[in-house]
UniProtKB/Swiss-Prot annotation:
PANTHER family in the record: MITOCHONDRIAL 28S RIBOSOMAL PROTEIN S21, SMALL RIBOSOMAL SUBUNIT PROTEIN BS21
UniProt similarity note: Belongs to the bacterial ribosomal protein bS21 family.
A GO molecular function held by the record: structural constituent of ribosome
Keywords, ordered alphabetically: Ribonucleoprotein, Ribosomal protein
UniProt keyword Transferase present: no
Pfam families linked to this entry: Ribosomal_S21
A GO CC term assigned to this protein in UniProt: ribosome
UniProt-recorded name of the protein: Small ribosomal subunit protein bS21
Length: 71
Protein backbone atom coordinates (compact mmCIF):
# COMPACT_ATOMS: atom_id res chain seq x y z
CA UNK A 1 0.00 0.00 0.00
CA UNK A 2 1.51 3.33 -1.04
CA UNK A 3 2.04 5.76 1.80
CA UNK A 4 2.43 9.49 1.25
CA UNK A 5 3.43 11.75 4.09
CA UNK A 6 2.10 15.26 3.71
CA UNK A 7 4.96 17.70 3.98
CA UNK A 8 4.81 20.90 5.95
CA UNK A 9 2.98 23.69 4.07
CA UNK A 10 2.21 21.29 1.21
CA UNK A 11 -1.15 21.82 -0.51
CA UNK A 12 -3.59 18.94 -0.34
CA UNK A 13 -3.81 18.78 -4.14
CA UNK A 14 -0.08 18.13 -4.46
CA UNK A 15 -0.16 15.39 -1.82
CA UNK A 16 -3.16 13.78 -3.52
CA UNK A 17 -1.35 13.89 -6.87
CA UNK A 18 1.71 12.22 -5.31
CA UNK A 19 -0.54 9.53 -3.80
CA UNK A 20 -2.24 8.88 -7.14
CA UNK A 21 1.13 8.60 -8.86
CA UNK A 22 2.42 6.14 -6.26
CA UNK A 23 -0.75 4.04 -6.62
CA UNK A 24 -0.29 4.02 -10.38
CA UNK A 25 3.33 2.89 -10.06
CA UNK A 26 2.31 0.12 -7.65
CA UNK A 27 -0.34 -1.08 -10.13
CA UNK A 28 -3.18 -1.03 -7.63
CA UNK A 29 -5.88 0.29 -9.97
CA UNK A 30 -4.99 -2.18 -12.72
CA UNK A 31 -5.13 -5.01 -10.20
CA UNK A 32 -8.51 -3.90 -8.87
CA UNK A 33 -9.94 -3.64 -12.38
CA UNK A 34 -8.60 -7.09 -13.25
CA UNK A 35 -10.19 -8.62 -10.15
CA UNK A 36 -13.49 -6.74 -10.42
CA UNK A 37 -15.18 -9.71 -12.13
CA UNK A 38 -14.31 -13.38 -12.07
CA UNK A 39 -12.36 -14.50 -15.10
CA UNK A 40 -12.35 -18.17 -15.98
CA UNK A 41 -8.87 -19.71 -16.13
CA UNK A 42 -9.30 -20.58 -19.81
CA UNK A 43 -10.20 -16.97 -20.60
CA UNK A 44 -7.21 -15.71 -18.64
CA UNK A 45 -4.86 -18.05 -20.53
CA UNK A 46 -6.40 -17.02 -23.84
CA UNK A 47 -5.97 -13.32 -23.02
CA UNK A 48 -2.38 -13.83 -21.89
CA UNK A 49 -1.53 -15.74 -25.06
CA UNK A 50 -3.09 -13.04 -27.25
CA UNK A 51 -1.05 -10.40 -25.42
CA UNK A 52 2.13 -12.41 -25.99
CA UNK A 53 1.37 -12.72 -29.71
CA UNK A 54 0.72 -8.99 -29.92
CA UNK A 55 4.00 -8.20 -28.13
CA UNK A 56 5.92 -10.48 -30.48
CA UNK A 57 4.32 -8.91 -33.57
CA UNK A 58 5.15 -5.44 -32.27
CA UNK A 59 8.76 -6.46 -31.60
CA UNK A 60 9.16 -7.97 -35.07
CA UNK A 61 7.65 -4.94 -36.79
CA UNK A 62 10.05 -2.65 -34.92
CA UNK A 63 13.01 -4.81 -35.98
CA UNK A 64 11.86 -4.84 -39.61
CA UNK A 65 11.39 -1.07 -39.60
CA UNK A 66 14.90 -0.62 -38.24
CA UNK A 67 16.34 -2.88 -40.97
CA UNK A 68 14.58 -0.91 -43.69
CA UNK A 69 16.01 2.37 -42.41
CA UNK A 70 19.58 1.03 -42.41
CA UNK A 71 19.71 0.66 -46.21
Amino acid sequence: MPIVKVRENEPFDVALRRFKRSCEKAGILADVRAREFYEKPTTARKRAKAAAVKRLAKKLSRENARRVRLY
